[in-house]
Amino acid sequence: MLCVALAVAMLVSCKSSKKTDAEQNAMSVAGPAFDADSAYAFCARQCEFGPRTMNSEAHDRCGEWIVAKFQQYGCTVQQQRADLKGYDGTTLKSNNIIASYKPELTTRILLCAHWDSRPWADNDPDSTNWRKPVMAANDGASGVAVMLEIARLLQKADSLKVGVDFVCFDAEDWGIPQWSDATDNGDSWALGAQYWSQNPHKPGYEARFGILLDMVGGAGARFYQEGFSKEYAQPIVNKVWTAARVAGYESLFPNDQGGYITDDHDPVNKNTGIPTIDIIAFYPNCQQSSFGPTWHTVSDTMDNIDKATLKAVGQTVIQVLFSEK
């Protein structure tokens, strides 16, 4: 992902998106308890394969594991394979993984995350690490881990009134590295999401709304309201931040403006019309990066994954899903 705009507005409370009393009163605590220990284990298992960089054995083996886990939890799984071109002309063997809970239901919610790893730790404070791959415990594995735990809970509860499509986007993090002389206009990122949004797994695919989970396991993370999410899907931002408040995680979901992030939700919004938001960590006071101290560094490992963060995000999404009628 790429942060394309950072401004004073990020730190100013967004008065227009404050929830009304009616919105808050309309939502009560709902859904099963999200198991952060289970999500943490899913995150660790992905990392055990090694960095899931494009065209690598670790990538392919992890993909097989993700497919098997969603199938284990009763989802119907499709794999959308495509040869995509990286910024440098490299052919990327991409595999978007789509797991559908209750595919027979016409009313659907889209949950998504990317599952590939950044091939270069180009934001590492040590320049000798810039061409090393990133383990991507947070920036990759955490979002998939939360989705897998939700899939496990849905199979167990089996009481959700809507269908859910879990989409694991590939080739998100092959964007132009900072050490390259190439001009970065954002098009080199989110390649799998770009492809899926133009070639959905089901012709004419529709969903009530979508939620992208990106970097949702980092220690000290907070989730501000991302700019493009507010632009394309303000009602969904309101819904999710209300759910966070009801679930007891208002402190991690402040009612403040974040940056404008080029991420997987961007092509989904532009090409499908499905109002989709990005739950993405924002660290306004971090000198290393507003995405946090481990972003695109060799330190993005399980040592820096916080179960409390996974719990807050996972329980918030559960609250959203089980509040849908």
Language-model-detected regions and their locations in the chain:
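Active-site-adjacent substrate-binding region
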Residues: 81, 91, 209, 216-325
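Solvent-exposed loop/turn segments at secondary-structure junctions
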Residues: 52-54, 83-86, 103-105, 115-119, ...
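N-terminal capping segment at the start of a domain
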Residues: 16-62, 73, 287-304
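A non-catalytic alpha/beta surface segment that caps or lines the substrate-entry region
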Residues: 44-104
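C-terminal motif of bacterial Sec signal peptides marking the signal peptidase cleavage site
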Residues: 10-13
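Acidic/histidine-rich catalytic neighborhood of metal-dependent amide-processing enzymes
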Residues: 131-235, 260, 264
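Extracytoplasmic/secreted proteins, especially bacterial periplasmic and envelope-associated proteins
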Residues: 38-45, 61, 65-72, 142-149, ...
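Second-shell loop/turn segments in exported
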Residues: 25-33, 48-57, 84-87, 129-141, ...
